[in-house]
């Protein structure tokens, strides 16, 4: 019913997709081999959830809090890799859209937390310190 795309059309499609996506294995490889050329953003949840479990090296910046002022802390050519809870969550898409609208390079880490867990990669955690 749906014939395969012509090879050149398939190449264009996959190049386009890979220009806006990465996966858990590629992010893990970059982290363990000290080849990280991106800022990893955990874009959903609250600080307590992030403290309990997140991808090592990630910063917690919920997508609703992404603003030009916040992102001005990084050089304009910084690549951001965003992730959320998993395929059932659209937080990474929302974050990526906001970052792209700000003119910043961005990719989504497909799979998110669920994908990271499925790959059996280790999570980071830390204890929150109360201000009181």
Please report, for each region that a protein language model flagged, where it lies by residue.
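Short, hinge-like loop/turn segments at secondary-structure boundaries
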Residues: 59, 77, 123-127
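Short active-site oxyanion
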Residues: 34-40, 56-57, 79, 105
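Flexible, polar/low-complexity N-terminal or interdomain linker segments that lie immediately upstream
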Residues: 1-48, 125-132
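Catalytic cysteine-centered active loop of the rhodanese-like fold, especially the PTP/DSP P-loop
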Residues: 69-117
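Terminal peptide-recognition signature
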Residues: 27, 58, 99
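Glycine-rich, highly charged phosphate/nucleotide-binding loops
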Residues: 61-69
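Short, charged/polar "capping" segments at the starts of alpha-helices
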Residues: 47-50, 90-91
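Short loop/helix-cap segments at secondary-structure boundaries that form the rim of catalytic
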Residues: 50-56, 116
């Amino acid at each position: 019913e749906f014939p395969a795309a012509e090879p050149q059309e398939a190449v264009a499609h996959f190049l386009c997709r890979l220009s806006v996506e990465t996966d858990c294995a590629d992010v893990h490889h970059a982290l363990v081999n000290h080849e990280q050329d991106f800022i990893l953003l955990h874009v959903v949840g609250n600080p307590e959830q992030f403290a309990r479990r997140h991808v090592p090296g990630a910063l917690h910046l919920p997508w609703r809090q992404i603003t030009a002022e916040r992102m001005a802390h990084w050089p304009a050519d910084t690549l951001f890799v965003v992730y959320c809870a998993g395929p059932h969550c659209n937080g990474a898409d929302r974050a990526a859209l906001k970052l792209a609208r700000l003119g910043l390079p961005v990719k989504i880490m497909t799979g998110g937390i669920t994908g990271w867990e499925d790959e059996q990669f280790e999570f980071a955690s830390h204890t929150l310190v109360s201000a009181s």
